[in-house]
Amino acid sequence: MKSRIEQALASAPEALSTHLAPIVLADDFDATISEQQFGELLNATNLSDKELRVALLPFAAAFSYAPISEFYVGAIVRGLSGRLYFGANMEFFGVQLGQTVHAEQCAISHAWMKGEHGVKDITINYSPCGHCRQFMNELSTAKELKIQLPERQEKSLHHYLPEAFGPADLGIESGLMAEVKHEFVCDEDDALIQKAVNAMNISHAPYTNNLSGIALEMNSGLVFQGAYAENAAFNPSLPPLQVALIQILMAGEKFEDIKAAALVENSQGKISHLADTQSTLEALNPDIPVSFVNV
């Protein structure tokens, strides 16, 4: 991944690469750019807001994990805080294609798990597919969301998804990323399970009630969490495992370094992620133990 970032720097205009390199090559770079850093880059490069976001796309795409298609897509969302979050597409050998994560989903989930409660805009390499348009329509900020493509004028999400079907059509008022704190507790004293419960408590599952979360422990001791992101159209829903894998990817860590997993689900839910979670982790590393708890 670092070599891809270095390649992107080599291809970028000198004014951008000179000022961006200390940010993206820093040991603590977390695939985000603060509002202050973005402002400094604007001043240093004399690019417009739109031009700079588009110029940053190759750096987001550098995080892509696409062993099947070898087609690398980047996305950048701006959270309500003003911080930019990178995202990239993610595929898995030996697993059905339904487990694939699109760059837009990645960037949005990246922002969500880092505490954002909505996104203002998204910048992407290519026009969003119907799957991603529907995924974005679940967001708490869907009505205001703007989409920026290279060499195009900024357009609203609903320009790309007219007469949209969404949460309101099913009587749901709260969208994905809205600030929420469910009150699930678990008596297990396992620290990884408790991390999964924490993720569960911010999950979004108004259609199946399968509020759920996962925690993945790395060999290094780092723990990454994922919360379930359900969708009114069902199929674009993003399972908790994928949301956690996104955090691993954007942290520059490797999937083969996952040491253990813990999945926690609502016992009153109408579905379960257990089988798909086990099969996907099995494809990544058959030795990963999975703890499972219903609460």
Curated annotation (Swiss-Prot):
<comment type="similarity">
    <text>Belongs to the cytidine and deoxycytidylate deaminase family.</text>
</comment>
<dbReference type="Pfam" id="PF08211">
    <property type="entry name" value="dCMP_cyt_deam_2"/>
</dbReference>
<feature type="binding site">
    <location>
        <position position="102"/>
    </location>
    <ligand>
        <name>Zn(2+)</name>
    </ligand>
</feature>
<dbReference type="GO" id="GO:0009972">
    <property type="term" value="P:cytidine deamination"/>
</dbReference>
<comment type="subunit">
    <text>Homodimer.</text>
</comment>
<keyword id="KW-0479">Metal-binding</keyword>
<dbReference type="Pfam" id="PF00383">
    <property type="entry name" value="dCMP_cyt_deam_1"/>
</dbReference>
<dbReference type="InterPro" id="IPR006263">
    <property type="entry name" value="Cyt_deam_dimer"/>
</dbReference>
<feature type="binding site">
    <location>
        <position position="129"/>
    </location>
    <ligand>
        <name>Zn(2+)</name>
    </ligand>
</feature>
<dbReference type="GO" id="GO:0004126">
    <property type="term" value="F:cytidine deaminase activity"/>
</dbReference>
<dbReference type="GO" id="GO:0008270">
    <property type="term" value="F:zinc ion binding"/>
</dbReference>
<protein>
    <recommendedName>
        <fullName>Cytidine deaminase</fullName>
        <ecNumber>3.5.4.5</ecNumber>
    </recommendedName>
</protein>
<keyword id="KW-0862">Zinc</keyword>
<feature type="domain" description="CMP/dCMP-type deaminase 2">
    <location>
        <begin position="187"/>
        <end position="295"/>
    </location>
</feature>
<dbReference type="InterPro" id="IPR050202">
    <property type="entry name" value="Cyt/Deoxycyt_deaminase"/>
</dbReference>
<dbReference type="InterPro" id="IPR020797">
    <property type="entry name" value="Cytidine_deaminase_bacteria"/>
</dbReference>
<feature type="active site" description="Proton donor">
    <location>
        <position position="104"/>
    </location>
</feature>
<feature type="binding site">
    <location>
        <begin position="89"/>
        <end position="91"/>
    </location>
    <ligand>
        <name>substrate</name>
    </ligand>
</feature>
<dbReference type="GO" id="GO:0042802">
    <property type="term" value="F:identical protein binding"/>
</dbReference>
<keyword id="KW-0378">Hydrolase</keyword>
<dbReference type="InterPro" id="IPR002125">
    <property type="entry name" value="CMP_dCMP_dom"/>
</dbReference>
<dbReference type="InterPro" id="IPR013171">
    <property type="entry name" value="Cyd/dCyd_deaminase_Zn-bd"/>
</dbReference>
<dbReference type="GO" id="GO:0005829">
    <property type="term" value="C:cytosol"/>
</dbReference>
<feature type="domain" description="CMP/dCMP-type deaminase 1">
    <location>
        <begin position="48"/>
        <end position="168"/>
    </location>
</feature>
<comment type="function">
    <text>This enzyme scavenges exogenous and endogenous cytidine and 2'-deoxycytidine for UMP synthesis.</text>
</comment>
<dbReference type="InterPro" id="IPR016193">
    <property type="entry name" value="Cytidine_deaminase-like"/>
</dbReference>
<dbReference type="InterPro" id="IPR016192">
    <property type="entry name" value="APOBEC/CMP_deaminase_Zn-bd"/>
</dbReference>
<feature type="binding site">
    <location>
        <position position="132"/>
    </location>
    <ligand>
        <name>Zn(2+)</name>
    </ligand>
</feature>
